[in-house]
Amino acid sequence: MKPIRFSKHALGYITSRGFAVAEVEEAIRTCAWSPAELGRLDCRKNFACGLTWNGKVYATKQVRPVFVEEAEEIVVITVYTYYF
């Protein structure tokens, strides 16, 4: 499998969006990829978390990386997280 590299943009949102690099890598390596806007790809993976986020407890965190597959690597452009 190709190495995964994170853009500066994606890395800049780790804290504010509440995802871990390992979660994103797991999503890309284990979930089905779907076409996304601008010729990019995305995928989604749910993680059980029981996390308090912005003062509310959530049972599930969904991580949705948006990325491109290049010849030698996968580049993560951004990562969205959803809590429910």
Residue ranges and their predicted role:
Residues M1-F84:
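Ribonuclease/tRNase effector modules and their secretory precursors
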